[in-house]
């Protein structure tokens, strides 16, 4: 008896969806491409937004920025919901492990009263700044154009909400979960002179209607100052005060802000390279935002660190902006 085994190849009729093929050609698409590109509705809207009847749903004119292709703002991390959740779950697992270790070893008892007081007064109120950052990025998700940008903005909004929650957890770790530290931090936020510039910045920024101006303000300038002043210089002060154990509780914040920078830098650089109009507009926004944020952080930096700390943070932000094709205007 002879047994013959025949094989045949099955060729798919289509490699991908039609909307993906129009952009990328007839080839297999990644999951990020399938859920991110050209999926936002553009026509046949049944009504205008009741809150802004002069606009349409998914309107490109919510920002003065102009793009030939709004899907040019692709995420280098290629985050869609599944990959984003998996990545952040790993960061959260590490953070939870760090907090559990801190509490199990009762490391808060080794901190001096001076350090605890300064952390409560100078670090914990940043949870309000992060809540504002959450709203800033919500604006990008609500009014932005193109799913590649809007989905990444909502992820960033959730990141800032997570940072705010972990800052609150630091307070609870210091006061034995009584919540007293959070009440003290709230009073500092509402009344201490060092915080009033940042309070004003947060409140006034929420009236801004251009979502991309908020994007630049938050991701380049505010996050730049926070990273340099809070998670570098203030962290170094903690080390000098034998409070290096607190550094493990801010690891989530540093890792998350570093990851957000990979994405936001790409978006800003792409926008600046699009046209001279965009570059001029972004430079004007950057110049305005840099002055506002520096003025807002100066009282805090003077109280928490040194007089020249805010100048170092400003220089770090300017150097970062130069790599993106931006610089402050000298005549502004």
Swiss-Prot record:
Molecular-function annotations in GO: phenol 2-monooxygenase activity
Keywords attached to this entry: Aromatic hydrocarbons catabolism, Monooxygenase, NAD, Oxidoreductase
Induction behaviour: By phenol.
Pfam short name (any one): Phenol_Hydrox
EC nos: 1.14.13.244
Segments crossing the lipid bilayer: none
Record keyword Nucleotidyltransferase present: no
Biological process terms in GO annotation: aerobic phenol-containing compound catabolic process
Top-level class of the enzyme under EC nomenclature: oxidoreductase
Annotated pathway: Aromatic compound metabolism; phenol degradation
Keyword Methyltransferase: no
Domain of life: Bacteria
Catalytic reaction equation(s): phenol + NADH + O2 + H(+) = catechol + NAD(+) + H2O
Family indicated by similarity: Belongs to the TmoE/XamoE family.
Functional note: Part of a multicomponent enzyme which catalyzes the degradation of phenol and some of its methylated derivatives.
Protein name (record): Phenol 2-monooxygenase, oxygenase component MhpL
Organism this protein belongs to: Acinetobacter pittii (strain PHEA-2)
């Amino acid at each position: 008896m002879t047994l013959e085994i025949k094989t045949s190849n099955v060729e798919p009729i289509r490699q991908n969806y039609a909307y993906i093929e129009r952009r990328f050609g007839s080839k297999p698409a990644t999951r990020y491409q399938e859920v991110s590109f050209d999926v936002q509705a553009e026509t046949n809207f049944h009504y205008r937004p009741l809150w802004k009847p002069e606009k349409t749903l998914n309107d490109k004119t919510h920002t003065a920025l102009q793009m030939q292709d709004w899907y040019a703002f692709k995420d280098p991390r290629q985050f869609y919901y599944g990959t984003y959740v998996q990545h952040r779950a790993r960061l959260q697992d590490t953070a939870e492990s760090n907090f559990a270790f801190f509490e199990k070893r009762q490391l808060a008892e080794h901190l001096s009263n001076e350090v605890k007081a300064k952390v409560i007064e100078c670090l914990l109120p940043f949870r309000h700044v992060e809540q504002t950052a959450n709203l800033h990025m919500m604006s990008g998700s609500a009014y932005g154009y193109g799913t590649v940008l809007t989905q990444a903005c909502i992820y960033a909004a959730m990141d800032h909400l997570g940072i705010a929650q972990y800052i609150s957890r630091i307070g609870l770790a210091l006061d034995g979960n009584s919540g007293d530290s959070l009440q003290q931090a709230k009073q500092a936020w509402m009344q201490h002179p060092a915080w009033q510039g940042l309070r004003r910045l947060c409140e006034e920024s929420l009236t801004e209607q251009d979502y991309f101006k908020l994007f630049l303000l938050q991701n380049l300038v505010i996050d730049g100052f926070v990273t340099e002043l809070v998670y570098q210089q203030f962290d170094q002060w903690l080390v000098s005060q034998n409070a290096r154990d607190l550094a493990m509780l801010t690891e989530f914040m540093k890792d998350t802000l570093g990851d957000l920078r990979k994405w936001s830098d790409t978006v800003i650089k792409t926008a600046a390279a699009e046209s001279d109009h965009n570059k001029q507009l972004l430079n004007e926004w950057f110049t305005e935002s840099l002055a506002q944020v520096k003025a807002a952080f100066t009282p805090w930096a003077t109280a928490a660190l040194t007089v020249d700390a805010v100048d170092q943070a400003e220089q770090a932000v300017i150097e970062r902006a130069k790599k993106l094709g931006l610089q402050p205007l000298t005549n502004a």
